[in-house]
Amino acid sequence: MPSANFRLARRGLLFVISSPSGAGKSTIARRILAEDDEIHLSVSVTTRPKRPGEVDGVDYHFVDVPTFKKMVAENQLLEWAHVFDNRYGTPRAPVEEMLHKGQDVLFDIDWQGAQQLWQQASGDTIRVYILPPSFEELERRLRGRGTDSEEVIQKRMARAASEISHWDGYDYVLINDDMDECVKQVKNILTVERIKRRRQIGLIGFTRKLLAPPED
């Protein structure tokens, strides 16, 4: 009889969290990673300058533009996008390795990256979009970070409406008016998606064994 710790083999999933800047996707992603040891962050490649406190290979893989273009040309990226004068992309090899090992991969990316990822791996990709409760609250959060200039804040606000217009391309859409509640909802989505039948690749073998005639 299976023990309380019995688990079937399953295929990993690609779990995307997107939002306009300031709506909370990065904070939610950090909370999920800290509280769930079965999911791992996809570390993006970027051409943007490293910010204080960021670690190469942990927060991002920081590269120059020629290196990034070479990675695109050689199909080393699952998805990539040009955002605020910088390029961002997802290295293909580590993601595919984790997926085949049954490990989940978390993506903190925008709608362009989510769309490309879906086009390449629709059966493995789950997309969650985080909305702010209002544009006023979105601006308040951006200013509260204290990391962006007035010019950058205005650019982010101007881009927010365009980004939000793509909400209907996602599987789940949440309004982040309470961070703890929003994190709870995201964790619930993750739990449900993990136990869907198509992900339980060990079910066929298990049921065959379960239904096999008992040996004499």
Curated annotation (Swiss-Prot):
Molecular functions (GO terms):
ATP binding; guanylate kinase activity
Annotated Guanylate kinase-like domain residues:
12-191
Reactions catalysed, as given in the entry: GMP + ATP = GDP + ADP
Gene3D superfamilies according to UniProt: Guanylate Kinase phosphate binding domain, P-loop containing nucleotide triphosphate hydrolases
* Top EC class of this enzyme: transferase
Q: GO cellular-component terms in the record?
A: cytosol
Q: Where in the cell is it found?
A: Cytoplasm
The EC number(s) this enzyme carries: 2.7.4.8
Q: Which UniProt keywords apply?
A: ATP-binding, Cytoplasm, Kinase, Nucleotide-binding, Transferase
SUPFAM superfamilies on file: P-loop containing nucleoside triphosphate hydrolases (SSF52540)
Q: Where does ATP bind?
A: S19, P20, S21, G22, A23, G24, K25, S26
Q: Which InterPro entries match?
A: GK/Ca_channel_bsu (IPR008145), Guanylate_kin-like_dom (IPR008144), Guanylate_kinase (IPR017665), Guanylate_kinase_CS (IPR020590), P-loop_NTPase (IPR027417)
Q: Which PROSITE patterns match?
A: GUANYLATE_KINASE_1, GUANYLATE_KINASE_2
Q: Which family does it belong to?
A: Belongs to the guanylate kinase family.
Q: What is this protein for, i.e. what is its function? A: Essential for recycling GMP and indirectly, cGMP.
Which protein is depicted?
Answer: Guanylate kinase
- Originating species: Zymomonas mobilis subsp. mobilis (strain ATCC 31821 / ZM4 / CP4)
Gene name of the record = gmk
